Design a protein with these regions (language model features):
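Short, conserved beta-strand element in jelly-roll/cupin
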Residues: 70-73, 82-99
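Short acidic-glycine-tyrosine-enriched beta hairpin
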Residues: 103-118
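A short hydrophobic beta-strand segment most commonly corresponding to one strand
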Residues: 69, 89, 115, 129-142
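Short beta-strand His + acidic residue motifs that chelate non-heme Fe in jelly-roll/DSBH
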Residues: 79-81, 99-100, 116, 121-128
Length: 142
């Protein structure tokens, strides 16, 4: 008989490994080279249990775009909000959860990409494993 608890442990371990690969990754373009491990995590100013790693900011991109790693603790949420004038994208790296994007519920699983145009209400809820996202904003959020 298959031991489902061991399969779940392996799934969580693999998710953590994938996230750590991003967490310790790098960004390279001709004008910018940055190691993600050198960027500190900061607490989200509004949502408890949410941390951000600002990979590229407005300062580095002339305001054109910004990239962020987002870590949402198990059972925590980024509640309903909008961005104006930013378009936001989420790439789910690891963990599980849900996103309510313009009233539509999306299962957030590794490999899912979601796009929130400017002024569209959205929220994100982490499951029991937590949730790890790569978020991008056009123009830059910060």
């Amino acid at each position: 008989m298959i031991d489902l608890s061991k399969m779940k442990e392996r799934s969580v371990d693999m998710n953590n490994e994938v996230f750590e690969a991003f967490n310790n990754g790098c960004f390279e373009v001709p004008e910018v080279e940055k190691s993600f491990k050198d960027v500190p995590w900061s607490k989200h100013p509004t949502f408890e249990g949410v941390e951000l790693k600002h990979i590229l900011t407005s300062k580095e991109t002339g305001g054109a775009y910004s990239f962020h790693l987002v870590r949402i603790a198990p059972g925590k949420s980024i509640l309903d909000h909008i961005h104006d004038p930013q378009l936001e994208t989420h790439e789910v790296i690891a963990g599980k959860g849900t996103c309510i994007n313009d009233g539509h519920e999306i299962a957030y699983l590794p490999g899912v990409i979601s796009v929130m145009p400017p002024q569209v209400h959205h929220e994100v809820h982490a499951g029991e494993e937590g949730l790890f996202l790569f978020a991008k904003f056009l123009p830059a959020l910060c």
